[in-house]
């Protein structure tokens, strides 16, 4: 798909989502093609994907398991945001039992628990599932690096490589450099966490801008 075609589709979808047409099942075909475009081109439109899941709620006979799996996998790539949880809330009970969807839900559970080694092992056991999502592995690695960056002062180099999906030395050096960490031989120096400690009030909140696409569907 050319850049012009992709931009045209993006504008068409944006127009649909701003009107009552978002509830028209006749628009499912273009919305589903838009999901597939996101998977191929490593783009992400959470609002459009929620609209697809909502249309499946209203029109269960039009449910497409493959498209739903792509939407859920794209939501995984946006951890630690709550996209996956909100997408899961729109799934009909009858489709939650789908084997592939159950596998993706399990991936989300262990990713949320920050069990990155187990996550990597499970993904390696189902390469065909995630290979269709362009940029999937790098997006997950960004989340891993985010957690490592706020958790460790130093980490064993082999352990870090394992957490990042069993990557080789060259790829590991890329991620170490990307996050400004330091290679100290067998250890990777992350940060002096004592310098990052600040007294603050902690509140659990979800930003309104993040909920807006979901509210528009209700």
Swiss-Prot record:
Tell me which residues make up the PCI domain.
Answer: 44-205
UniProt keyword Cytoplasm, yes or no:
yes
The record ties this protein, via Gene3D superfamilies, to: ARM repeat, domain 1 (1.25.40.250), Winged helix-like DNA-binding domain superfamily/Winged helix DNA-binding domain (1.10.10.10)
Q: What are this entry's molecular-function GO terms?
A: ribosome binding; RNA binding; translation initiation factor activity
Q: Where in the cell is it found?
A: Cytoplasm
What GO terms in the biological process aspect are recorded for it? formation of cytoplasmic translation initiation complex; regulation of translational initiation
Superkingdom of this entry's organism? Eukaryota
- One of the record's GO cellular component terms: eukaryotic 48S preinitiation complex
Q: List the keywords (alphabetical).
A: Cytoplasm, Initiation factor, Protein biosynthesis
Tell me if Cell inner membrane is a UniProt keyword of this record: no
Tell me, in one coarse class, where this protein mainly resides.
cytoplasm
Pfam families, per the entry: CSN8_PSD8_EIF3K (PF10075)
Assembly mode: Component of the eukaryotic translation initiation factor 3 (eIF-3) complex.
Role noted for this protein? Component of the eukaryotic translation initiation factor 3 (eIF-3) complex, which is involved in protein synthesis of a specialized repertoire of mRNAs and, together with other initiation factors, stimulates binding of mRNA and methionyl-tRNAi to the 40S ribosome. The eIF-3 complex specifically targets and initiates translation of a subset of mRNAs involved in cell proliferation.
What family does this belong to? Belongs to the eIF-3 subunit K family.
Q: What is this protein called?
A: Eukaryotic translation initiation factor 3 subunit K
Protein source organism: Bombyx mori
- Taxonomic lineage of the native organism: Eukaryota, Metazoa, Ecdysozoa, Arthropoda, Hexapoda
């Amino acid at each position: 798909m050319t850049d012009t075609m992709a931009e045209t589709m993006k504008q068409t979808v944006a127009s649909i989502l701003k009107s009552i047409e978002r509830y028209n099942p006749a628009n499912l075909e273009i919305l589903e093609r838009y999901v597939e475009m996101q998977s191929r081109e490593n783009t992400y439109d959470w609002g459009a994907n929620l609209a697809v899941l909502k249309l499946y709620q209203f029109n269960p006979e039009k449910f497409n398991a493959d498209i739903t799996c792509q939407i859920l996998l794209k939501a995984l790539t946006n951890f630690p945001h709550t996209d996956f949880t909100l997408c899961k809330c729109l799934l009909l009970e009858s489709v939650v039992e789908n084997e592939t969807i159950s596998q993706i839900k399990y991936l989300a559970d262990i990713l949320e628990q920050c069990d990155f080694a187990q996550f990597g092992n499970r993904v390696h056991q189902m390469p065909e599932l995630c290979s269709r999502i362009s940029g999937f592995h790098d997006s997950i690695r960004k989340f891993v690096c985010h957690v490592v960056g706020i958790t460790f002062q130093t980490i064993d180099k082999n352990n870090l490589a394992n957490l990042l999906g069993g990557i080789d030395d060259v790829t590991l050096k890329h991620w170490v450099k990307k996050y400004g960490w330091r290679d100290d031989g067998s250890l990777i120096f992350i940060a002096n966490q004592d310098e990052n400690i600040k007294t603050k009030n902690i509140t659990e909140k979800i930003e309104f801008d993040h909920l807006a696409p979901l509210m528009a569907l209700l």
